């Protein structure tokens, strides 16, 4: 009988980060996956990052995760979105080579010390006295474990739809996991049904690219990982085209065979990534919808048409695509499809991602109702870290909303739950000026080092960078510029007001039209400062007042977060709460007064009652 400290079920983006985190912190770990060759497979688009998602990938990286490094090594196009806007909403995105990304992740998992892999399907979770003790596989083998992380993606009772044809599958070409879902139901977990979809895959040779608009990556490309010095790979272009009125007519003509509009699909789909048939029906006044043709890799003819996810019958998909400019002769390699799958209500979880019902059982990824590789990877990493800490009998690592987008993601899930596939946006983060991509290492690298996932070399580089930022800020604060004719001429050529008195370089940099590079004219020695330091210093100086106000908000918020409820606290015994508030508190079981304050319906008066009760019982 096999025994491991941690067992991880599922070799997708959540499962990879989870098993690597456990093994890298010295715990013998087993990854159970249906097909070893599918470890790290990108089931949908061949891309990482995007608005707010790029923030998650950077945070995964500085905490010691793998996604950013793999993206830098296998990327084929890199772009920074919202580059002309403020630093809070700038986000990185990369097209990757789908096959290379999968191979890179598979190699990493296979070569990781303390990590074993088994090809199997988990049929049952084994429990003793409300604590996980192991799993049983489809070969009737029992594997014992101290902690179990479930990261099954869309595989639990997965059902694929193409037109009115449907069949059981976890994704195209892979069987669904039936037993695991049934096992969770028997354990009494609240479960629901969600739906997602993907686009048809196209043959590159059948596309007329001369009719399409090319979209290039940024030069030079900016890496995702703080450990990557630079990216030297040749970038590939993407192409842009649009649907048209004829396309929309074809789509409408096929709605009588659409599983979405015939009531066949019961699961709730992603609000922010609707199918093309959903777009045409919901936005009937729009004459066209944008499509990005994204190469699947360097050595494949497969093309991913981003923006045209569909579950229409294949004949309708073909006619629809051939009505689009540049795709008049297109051949479909694989049709688009929708997939329904089971998920567990994430309010069943503690902020550590451990379930409230079963000790030692953790959930990560789409099982929690999220969509996206990045959201999955973030949860997998945190589940892995906290499973390791659980095995060692230590307190979990819980990122606050003011610490990271990962903290926002998990807090939203465990506090509010979700009725539709959840995706991250910058608008979900109330402290987004503090939670920027550029300062992810300054916010979280120390934590990654403390939990044992950041190596000495990367930690030393981080310390040197932090010191360089502090030294540069000190330097430009002390260097003075006199209001001489020569200096004022320099300012005039930049379109900046002349000086009337001595000013520091820091004061000059505060001006919106001045950038760090402009300071070189006053002090040539600044030219040797790395660009990453220049960018960080410029942001900190220009947004100093806003950042200070946000940090004051965070301090006020922290006072509520620091008031914790003990595990045994009985919300049902608190006198003075309304029935509605009491029921919600008993369901969510918030870990802190801060989390309680974010539960719908919990009023300031209710928070005061809880505070008084904590004091009465001697917890404060």
Region locations from a protein language model:
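Conserved beta-strand-loop-beta-strand element in the redox core of flavoprotein oxidoreductases
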Residues: 126-142
